[in-house]
Amino acid sequence: MPFLPITKEETEALGWDCPDFVLVTGDAYVDHPTFGPAIISRLLESKGYRVAMLAQPDWKTDRDFTRFGKPRLGFMVSAGNIDSMVAHYTAARRRRSDDAYSPGNRPGLRPDRAVTVYAKKIRELYPDSPIILGGLEASLRRFAHYDYWDDAIRPSVLVESGADLLTYGMGERQSVEIADRLAAGEPVSSLRDIRGTCYLIPTKEYEPGPAVDCPSYEQVCASKREYAISCRKQQDEQDAVRGKRLLQKHGKMLLVQNPPALPLDGAELDAIYELPYMRTWHPCYADQGGVPAIQEVEFSITHNRGCFGGCNFCAIAFHQGRMVTTRSEESVLREAKLLTQLPNCLLYTSPSPRDCS
């Protein structure tokens, strides 16, 4: 299956007047199932939607963001596979000299706090176009949070970015439901009941219902104890079965987190990982040496999602949930057979360390 279009000329060659969605990512375009933007774009494609890829746009000008014009349904925005600040800085707060998720290991091709910068640029250019945030950076910054690089509490990324919706955790279910409802003519402002999403509304517009109140942004800024209480409540409601809606005030606005999306079952995971990925970086990066991040995962196989561990140093349980779901043996074997047919295939694979727990 060919790569998804990355230029206006490619969309025109496909006979598109405009894409349904433009998926903006801070990583180079790698069509591989270990890259979140690849999964979401291929899944939407499988549902009949036209998706164009805008990888590492130049945020200092309008040119890249106007490449495809205004999409029919909206923009989906991700910083990429990791937080843009982690991509840019070491634990000593020093600027990194490389970026494995960029062509040729070249640093500086995405901005700091990428989802916020991208969303603001899109809002400036297309004020009425829906903007949906997703990916790790958006997901882990959805509440008021401590930022290591600022050494301060920052508000929800929804407050800073001005986006309409945020999908948190693994985003397949949410993305398809959002796409289907936008395609049916629902305004993005009405999409307030989708599991696995967050949104902002004026506090006075919130209709009371079963929910858990977190300490406000102002409270967590002023008190470490209130910050700890907020974090505990967020962790307590991460269960997809019993988790409740969470609320957190930011001034006159209210952040609403709907309960987590239900995890995909085995058959759904099989379908996701058997979508027609090209399983490598886009050929436009060939003369730059490709994208180094693919090297560790090119011949890997994802067997399961979720983790019961909840280790302090790891965000997997908070992002993927504690419920572990697995693919079928038949699906894993089909993928293994497919890998053996790829050029330069390594005829062995090993588990991720986290899967050995």
At which residue positions do the language-model features occur?
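Single conserved hydrophobic/aromatic residue that forms the stacking wall/gate
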Residues: 348-357
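Short N-terminal or domain-adjacent regulatory/targeting segments
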Residues: 1-15
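Conserved C-terminal portion of the radical SAM core fold
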Residues: 153, 161-165, 336, 340-347
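Glycine-rich beta-alpha loop elements in corrinoid/cobalamin-binding modules
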Residues: 36, 55-250, 257
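Long hydrophobic segments that form regular secondary structure
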Residues: 268-277, 281, 291, 295, ...
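Nucleic acid-processing catalytic cores of prokaryotic defense/repair systems
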Residues: 19-25, 32-69
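N-terminal pre-triad scaffold of radical SAM enzymes
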Residues: 24-29, 288-315
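Conserved alpha-helical substructure of the radical SAM core
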Residues: 320-344
